[in-house]
């Protein structure tokens, strides 16, 4: 009898152990199984029939669903949905109140998000922008400067201080803001109270450089220029594909990309910032390596020159970011910012380049920028001094 009790207890112990192991195995599989989430089904809109969705190669922060009779629904991650209503049509009755209506034809746009201007330029859409959140002196995109000089585009105040009276008098059909508007939500609320749709763009949150460029397709939907956008975007993807398919894509070369601020600190990109990724796509390796991950709200960081020296002095190439404090033309101008740079390998070997001030406004040409960086890393032509977005310091 005693023996049977012991056997029963042993069997129970084995059974419990087996069940525990099974549960652990199931949990483990659940945690590490790859995601099989399918794309969200298109929204059901009263009176409209879903037709198809826009094909996107790199962009992940927006989507576009097309419906019958030319209607299109734009969805921007964390920022809402926008129904683009064709000219001569009306928004369907019973439309979800959270969906913002944008009526075509779309004119007199108030463009506050500077990165979007070049995307409109690429699709020949600058004429649709009447109001700028940047003054003429702040634009490096020639078409925008020209439009402001002729009066076809006028300054209507920056994101936190718009000229409401001017915006209303000009019959603004849409305000396009960057996520900076979230620091002043009352501005967005007031624009919407005046009946002006507000679209907050998130191109800077794209994980792939060409994801930013692909936002031109979103703006093309607003203007009915999808074919133009497809062609312009393909030009950039073709350039990237050419670089990636090249025999010398794995250069093993290290690249430091930075600028020195007014107090002598070095401003560098974080490891997963899009500039760092462009360097990697071009066949290089970004340094310093331990600058942390970008949280999108802040894709750069400052470090003291001594720390930067220790981590980047052996970089094969230097690309100086001129966007903040102006372009450099000579090595001496660079060394005037810090004499420690004289000991850098890239300076000693004459491998120092500088960006043009238009680099960060021209978001449609990121494929070209990757091509430029690849050329820098692979060229054997010592006489090469000028590229599309970079020039060599002498």
Residue ranges and their predicted role:
Residues 4-17:
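Bacterial N-terminal signal peptides that target proteins for export
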Residues 72-76, 82-168, 174-180:
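A short, structured surface patch at a secondary-structure boundary
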Residues 103, 157-162, 178-185, 206-213, ...:
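Soluble non-cytosolic domains of exported or imported proteins
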Residues 206-235, 317-394:
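Structured C-terminal subdomain patch of bacterial secreted/periplasmic proteins
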Residues 243-329:
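Flexible, glycine-rich surface segments
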Residues 16-27:
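Bacterial N-terminal signal peptides
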Residues 29-117, 228-257, 381-394:
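Bacterial Sec-exported substrate-binding components of ABC uptake systems
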Residues 107, 115-117, 132-143, 183-186, ...:
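Extracytoplasmic ligand-binding site segments that recognize negatively charged/polar headgroups
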């Amino acid at each position: 009898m005693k023996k049977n009790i012991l056997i029963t207890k042993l069997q129970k112990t084995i059974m419990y152990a087996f069940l525990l192991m099974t549960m652990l195995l199931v949990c483990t599989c659940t945690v590490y199984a790859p995601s099989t989430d399918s794309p969200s089904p298109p929204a059901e809109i009263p009176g409209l029939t879903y037709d198809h969705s826009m094909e996107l190669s790199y962009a992940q922060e927006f989507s576009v669903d097309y419906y019958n009779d030319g209607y299109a629904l734009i969805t921007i991650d964390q920022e809402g949905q926008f129904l683009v209503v064709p000219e001569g049509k009306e928004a369907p009755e019973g439309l979800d109140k959270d969906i913002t209506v944008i009526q075509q034809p779309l004119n007199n746009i108030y463009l506050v998000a500077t990165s979007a201007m070049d995307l409109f330029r690429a699709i020949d859409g600058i004429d649709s922008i009447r109001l700028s959140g940047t003054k003429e002196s702040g634009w490096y995109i020639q078409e925008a400067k020209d439009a402001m000089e002729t009066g076809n585009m006028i300054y209507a105040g920056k994101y936190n201080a718009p000229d409401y009276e001017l915006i209303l008098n000009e019959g603004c059909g849409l305000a396009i803001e960057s996520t900076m508007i979230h620091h002043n939500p009352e501005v967005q609320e007031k624009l919407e109270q005046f009946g002006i749709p507000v679209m907050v763009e998130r191109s800077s949150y794209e994980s792939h450089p060409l994801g930013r460029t692909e936002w031109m397709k979103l703006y093309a939907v607003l203007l009915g220029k999808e074919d133009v956008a497809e062609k312009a975007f393909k030009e950039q993807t073709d350039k990237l594909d050419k670089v990636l398919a090249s025999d010398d894509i794995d250069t093993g070369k290290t690249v430091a990309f930075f600028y020195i601020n007014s107090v002598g600190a070095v401003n560098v990109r974080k490891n997963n910032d899009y500039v760092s990724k462009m360097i990697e796509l071009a066949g290089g390796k970004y340094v310093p390596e331990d600058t942390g991950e970008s949280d999108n709200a802040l894709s750069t960081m400052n470090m003291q020159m001594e720390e930067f020296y220790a981590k980047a002095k052996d970089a094969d190439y230097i690309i100086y970011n001129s966007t903040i404090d102006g372009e450099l033309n000579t090595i001496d101008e660079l060394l005037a910012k810090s004499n420690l740079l004289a000991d850098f390998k890239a300076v000693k070997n004459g491998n120092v380049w500088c960006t043009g001030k238009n680099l960060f406004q021209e978001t449609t040409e990121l494929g070209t920028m990757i091509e430029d960086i690849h050329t820098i890393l692979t060229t054997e032509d010592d006489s090469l001094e000028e590229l599309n977005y970079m020039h060599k310091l002498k």
